[in-house]
Amino acid sequence: MIIEEIQGNIANLSQDEKQKHVEKVYLENSDLVKRIQRVKTDHGNEIGIRLKQPIDLQYGDILYQDDTNMIIVDVNSEDLLVIKPRNLKEMGDIAHQLGNRHLPAQFTETEMLIQYDYLVEDLLKELGIPYSHEDRKVNQAFRHIGHSHD
C-alpha cells in the first residue's frame, strides 16, 4: 500500500468515527518531515508513504481508512527540555539565547519545548530559569528555519 495524501486527523473525528480498529505507525520526530518513507505498522504491515504535497506529518494524521479500520501516525517520545519561564523577562532572555543558537522550539501556553541539549540545560541552571528534563511526545516536527546574516 502506498499513501499519497493525509485523510484527516483523529482530533477532528466524531466519537463514532474513533471507534474504528486503529493500526499505528510510530515515527521519530525527525521522520515527520519526510514526504517519502517506508514504514511498518504496529500490526507488522509495511506501507509506503509518498506524499504529493510538501507537508509535515503530525500526531494523529490518518494515513488510511475504510469502513472499519484506520492507520494513524503516532510519535515516539522525545528527550526534551521543558522550559517554564516565570515572567516575560525570563521568557525573552531564554528565547534570545535559544535563537542565537538556532535551536528550534515549540510552545504551549506556559512552556517552551526544545530537544535536549546539555549546554542549554547548563545555561538554564546558570540563569535560574525553571525547567524539567522529560520524555514527552510532541505533535509536530521540530523544524529549523533557515536564514542568513547578509
Swiss-Prot record:
Transmembrane segments: none annotated. One of its GO terms (cellular component) is cytoplasm. One of its GO terms (biological process) is protein-containing complex assembly. Coiled coil: none annotated. One of its GO terms (molecular function) is nickel cation binding. SMART domains: UreE_N. Keywords: Chaperone, Cytoplasm, Nickel, Nickel insertion. Pfam families: UreE_C, UreE_N. It comes from the Bacteria. It is found in: Cytoplasm. Its main location: cytoplasm. Belongs to the UreE family. Involved in urease metallocenter assembly. Binds nickel. Probably functions as a nickel donor during metallocenter assembly. This is Urease accessory protein UreE. It comes from Staphylococcus epidermidis (strain ATCC 35984 / DSM 28319 / BCRC 17069 / CCUG 31568 / BM 3577 / RP62A).
